[in-house]
């Protein structure tokens, strides 16, 4: 699957280079619409840090850079991780004294835990063309806001433990969602050749979420408390510019 994604991105990059190769970013600041893929490694803070360790996120988005180097973007990310704190205690009420869950065949189940979620954000900011090879590259700063959802992923390796399937699983996953704000600083590089276009930087996110399940099965209680959490991440993006053109003439904004 990963190989197919990489090949697809390389194909799009090649097509973009062939179709739009007469547009130059080295002479002046131009309007640059771009699609991109992104990866981040994040460390949690606040309430979610009590449950999860570091996680990763992969996603994509669309960004447009104006001639005056203002930036506007829409982005979505899938969040995943395997670092769960005290995960085994969630199933204590359906486990043996040794901490195992008995499956439908009478054997021990291989239950695993992880983190899964997603975020969707709108962002805007400014690029500063200093310490850069052309007027369309340089340090940038962006802020944004959107929606975040996060929960515990419970995986039954043999798929034979009905205690953690379907609606029963929902009683243990601590689903929470709500609003999120983000701030990003880093460096955007758009090459003169149009083949290498990337961003590297750091992102901070502050979320305000709320538990959404009717009842937690491990406690037997309804929990509608709110969470205040942070994410501190290192982020990279790979861009594919989409310059406009006419049949014979290319626009230089």
Put a short name on every predicted segment.
Residues 22-31, 68-69, 130-138, 190-198, ...:
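Short loop/turn motifs that connect adjacent beta-strands in outer-membrane beta-barrel proteins
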